Amino acid sequence: MTVKTRFAPSPTGYLHVGGARTALYSWLFAKNQGGEFVLRIEDTDLERNSQEAVDAIIEGMHWMGMEWDEGPYYQSKRFDRYNEVVDQLLAEDKAYKCYASKELLDEIRAEQEANKEMARYDANHPKIVAANAAAKEGDACVIRFRNPKEGSVVFDDQIRGRIEISNSQLDDLIIRRTDGAPTYNFVVVVDDWDMGITQVIRGEDHINNTPRQINIYEALGAPVPMFAHCAMILGDDGAKLSKRHGAVSVMQYRDEGYLPNALNNYLVRLGWSHGDQEIFSQEEMINLFSLSAVSKSASAFNTDKLLWLNNHYIKSSEPEYVAKYLQWHLDQKEISLDNGPAITEVIKLVGERCNTLIELAEQSRYFYQDFEEFEAGAAKKHLRGVAKGPLELALAKVEALEEWTTENLHNVIEEVCAELEIGMGKIGMPLRVAVTGGGQSPSVDAVMQLVGKERVVARIKMALAFIAEREANA
């Protein structure tokens, strides 16, 4: 039997990190087992759904690299199928019409609470029996599933172990509302049955739904999938993860300069482990992932750890991979690569210094765009009269260079130091400020090589003009 998992988000908002981790676990399990992964959009809540949310979910899945084998399926396009199954259950007396109004049910619930009884629907309650008896054909009604009254629902959760719920704790679930809309617990059963889902991996907030769904599977004679319920994700303060803990949308992490490999690596470790290993390639995740190694306990989201991983992936990934995701940030900052070095060479040079792609994009700017002024602090410290002679000599030497290589530029700097009998800092720092506009960069000879001869010459002249003006105004 082919293993088949699914991710089934509701399009009422963005793809948040909890949902992204669930999707990742489902995707990894399917790939580990040589199975298939299905994307299903659970859009039966027509009032709250939005196409914008659907687009955001699909964009987030693509960005994370979780491609699906089937789908996306949309529940809103399957209402005929749901009605067909409702009719089947009605015909087999496994479901029935209920005419009790919301007001009547609220009244009964209040009585139960006043009597310190468990508030639940009871088909045999005299008032409900009377309401059903008084109903006429065509009156508004819901359809309820006839839940077994005896015995228990038992299932082996692949993360939490054996779970048992008495049927006496479960009431007769509404499977179709008065407006004809099917309900969540019903449609997911029909979908998972029709789509051949073998493993349902989802958040622990669905544990209470599982026994209800299992009873519907069994009433339909459908195979019951295996279930695995993941613990929740907490903020670093121990509270449930929310917006106040920082970014919670997958695409917000994209916007803040994270690589998908870094986020995937972080999310897979947020509840799953393989010894002490922290860094996992996608291939390793697929080969090593197992539900038995997923923790039952909640995990705390640590932004500093994610940032550390992001820096690791910026430094260690192939430059072409980083460039693919850097491009979006370059576009946001209106940095065109048309007039400058290959971006992969810039990534090799400055990537190690960057924690995010936002930083990398900003530190790439001076390779492609000229600046009109120097950073005030760096210029005040390093573009002084004492730097005039070293910069003039360096300018003459770089203008005379026939081969524009890092080695030759390094030799120029050493020659200036030797001829003027000055330390490396006396020319290195003024050159750095002149060429980059600021006081921090990788090795200045490597930077100059990538910036290019024409720009380096022009920027040294600009620095000398700045020094001359500064001395004139002193």
Curated annotation (Swiss-Prot):
InterPro entries: aa-tRNA-synth_I_cd-bd, aa-tRNA-synth_I_codon-bd_sub2, aa-tRNA-synth_I_CS, aa_tRNA-synth_I_cd-bd_sf, Glu-tRNA-ligase_bac/mito, Glu/Gln-tRNA-synth, Glu/Gln-tRNA-synth_Ib_cat-dom, GluQ/Sye. ATP binds at residue 243. The keyword Cytoplasm applies. It is found in: Cytoplasm. A motif ('KMSKS' region) lies at residues 240-244. Monomer. This is Glutamate--tRNA ligase. It comes from Aliivibrio fischeri (strain MJ11).
